[in-house]
């Protein structure tokens, strides 16, 4: 028997609608939190004021315990956010932008890496949007280099591979990723399938196999290890465009003794967050995605994620703020907020 976690006390950190993104950025999404050396670091995707999707890093002060607040984005002396790497060359497979970082520490003689979803063209969503999984490797001086080619791509019937979640295992690396025709556009229903793949070196990957079906509709995942085994959190990707009807949103949890790529080794998914519940904060009212879990020094768990605001059109949001003598939000088709919550044990779930 394993305890089922419960998400409590959600808190936004960076919010597009409220204008709390750091200077030089319009929004941040898909946080990935790890202890790196003497400090906690948060790798995150960001949309710059120059309209570029880049990867960034925020930190807590050295020696401090992980918490939801107090993260400082790495910046220049002038206060401008510093991306992990320069923009990809024009015409490259990820020239449209870099999203959804996943940090993996040094393993089996390989350096630290950041896997990410690279977008080919300008389209973020809908037919014609296309993604593949790429990787950055850390140099001895701490800087990052971008691999010229993707490590995972789609198939003719499902051209996009995105949302990588990579963990080191005894014989190499294991990756879960989203297989989809494209990112969901306005009025569309999601067509999501999670797949799993293995690699001895983290670069050349095995033929992927289905881990979660299209019927289940999971968009991305995060794994963490605890005293009673492994937990996988799964999200459905959020209702970006306010489409109705749309699959129920939130977070689900499964348990296993090992980070197995075989779905039969995992318990049935149990819903641990219902973002359709009446008390849900508005900043995550249309669902959450990009989960990442960190353990505090006293054994508590924090889950970081990105929520989609249950918002009105930009025009209506802007009018309401102007009427209240507040600055209007940045023009956007939807509004994201990145934050987190506590992940508390609650109840028991059987395997």
Where are these regions (language model features)?
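Beta-rich carbohydrate-recognition and catalytic domains
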Residues: 1-96, 104-162, 167-219, 225-284, ...
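Intrinsically disordered, low-complexity, Lys/Arg-biased terminal tails
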Residues: 286-288
């Amino acid at each position: 028997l394993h305890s089922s976690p419960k998400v409590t006390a959600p808190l936004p950190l960076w919010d597009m609608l409220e204008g709390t993104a750091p200077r030089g950025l319009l929004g941040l999404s898909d946080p990935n939190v790890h202890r790196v050396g003497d400090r906690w670091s948060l790798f995150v995707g960001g949309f710059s004021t120059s309209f570029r999707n880049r990867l960034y890093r925020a930190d807590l002060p050295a020696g401090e315990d992980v918490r939801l607040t107090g993260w400082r984005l790495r910046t220049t002396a002038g206060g401008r956010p510093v991306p992990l790497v320069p923009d990809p060359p024009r015409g490259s497979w990820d020239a449209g932008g870099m999203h959804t970082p996943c940090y993996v520490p040094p393993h089996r003689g390989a350096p630290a890496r950041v896997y990410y979803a690279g977008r080919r063209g300008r389209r973020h969503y809908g037919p014609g949007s296309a993604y593949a999984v790429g990787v950055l490797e850390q140099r001895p001086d701490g800087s990052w280099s971008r691999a010229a080619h993707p490590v995972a791509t789609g198939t003719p019937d499902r051209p996009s591979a995105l949302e990588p979640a990579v963990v080191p295992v005894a014989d190499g690396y294991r990756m879960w990723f989203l297989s989809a025709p494209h990112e969901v556009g306005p009025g569309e229903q999601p067509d999501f399938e999670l797949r799993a793949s293995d690699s001895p070196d983290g670069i050349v990957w095995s033929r992927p196999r289905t881990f979660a079906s299209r019927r289940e509709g999971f968009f991305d995942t995060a794994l963490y290890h605890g005293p009673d085994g492994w937990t996988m959190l799964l999200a459905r990707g959020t209702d970006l465009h306010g489409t109705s009807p749309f699959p129920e949103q939130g977070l689900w949890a499964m348990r296993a003794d090992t980070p197995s790529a075989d779905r039969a080794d995992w318990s049935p998914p149990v819903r641990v967050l219902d973002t359709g519940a009446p008390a849900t904060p508005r900043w995550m009212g249309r669902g959450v995605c990009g989960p990442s879990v960190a353990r505090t020094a006293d054994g508590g768990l924090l889950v970081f994620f990105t929520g989609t605001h249950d918002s009105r059109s930009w025009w209506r949001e802007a009018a309401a703020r102007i009427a209240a003598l507040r600055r209007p939000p940045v023009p956007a088709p939807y509004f994201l907020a990145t934050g987190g919550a506590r992940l508390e044990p609650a109840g028991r779930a059987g395997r």
